[in-house]
C-alpha cells in the first residue's frame, strides 16, 4: 500500500483537542527501523509503539513509515487502524531515499516531513549506506529532529506533547521521571562554526542544563562553557563541565566510552554539515556508541532540535 492509497483507505482522524491545536498543523515524521530493532515483540520499534501509541494518536502525529517497519507494527498489532500511519516502499525499493527527499521538502508541500525516528543498529550494513548518511545530514541541515535511539524516540514523543501544550502531569509519573535530568550526565559538543551557538544555547537554558547531575564536553567547547558558567555566578574555579580532549585529539572517543559505560545519557552535538571534517571517523564512532546504547542514551544534533527539547523540558518543574 502506498502512502497515497493508505490515506484514501483510512478514516479521517478525530478533531484535535485545544492543547493539540497549539501545534501548527499535524506534525509529520518519518519512521524507520533496522532489522534488529523491528524484529519481535520486544524490539525497540515495538517497545516504542506500545509506550507511545496513546500520545501519538492524541497528537495526530503522522508517521510516514518505510515498508518493513510498517509491516512489523501491523504484525505486532500496534497502531492498527491509525489513520496517521502511512506506508512507503521498502528500503531496497527506495523508501529511505524518499524520506530523505521529504526532509528536504519533498516534491509537493504536503509531503514535507518535520523529522525522523530511525532506530539504528550500528552493525547493520545499511547504517553506512549513502541514503542513511544523507538522511541524517539533511535533518541537521534543515534543523529537523533526527532520532536514532529507543530512548530518544520515547523522549521525543513526550517533547512533542509538552510543546503542544499538554500538562506535564498528564504524561504520567514514569515519563516525568525519565525526563528528569537530575541523575543524568550530559555531553556538550560543537564544531567550530557552531561553538557560538552552543554557548548561546547554554546561556539561554542555563538553569535547565544545570539540573543535570554532571556535564562533560570536548576541549575548546568545554572551556567556553566554563567561562559562561562563571560569568553566570557558578562558583569560581569549579568547572561547570568536565573537559576532555578536543575532537581531533580524541575527545569524541572519550565521550563515546562514557556512553558505552552508561555514564552519559544525553549528547547535545551541534554539527556543521557544510564542511569536510578531518576527524570524521571519530565523530561517527561517537554517534555509533550512542546507537549501541540506544535503550538509555539520546542525541540532539542541531540547535533547532535542542531548542525544541529545552522548550518542552522547561515546562516541567524540578522535583
Segments from the language model and where they lie:
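General beta-strand structural signal in soluble alpha/beta enzymes
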Residues: 31, 63-66, 86-89, 118, ...
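Short internal beta-strands
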Residues: 59-73, 212-225
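Glycine-rich, charge-decorated loop segments at or immediately adjacent to ligand/cofactor-binding or catalytic sites
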Residues: 72-76, 151-165, 225-228, 301-318
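Mid-chain, well-packed structural core segment of small domains
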Residues: 95-135, 249-284
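Active-site rim loops that border cofactor/substrate pockets in soluble metabolic enzymes
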Residues: 75-102, 227-255
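N-terminal phosphate-binding or glycine-rich loops at protein starts, especially the Walker A/P-loop
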Residues: 18-62, 182-213
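Conserved beta-alpha
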Residues: 85, 150-158, 163-185, 192-193, ...
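Short, acidic/small-residue loops that bind anionic groups at enzyme active sites
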Residues: 132-157, 285-309
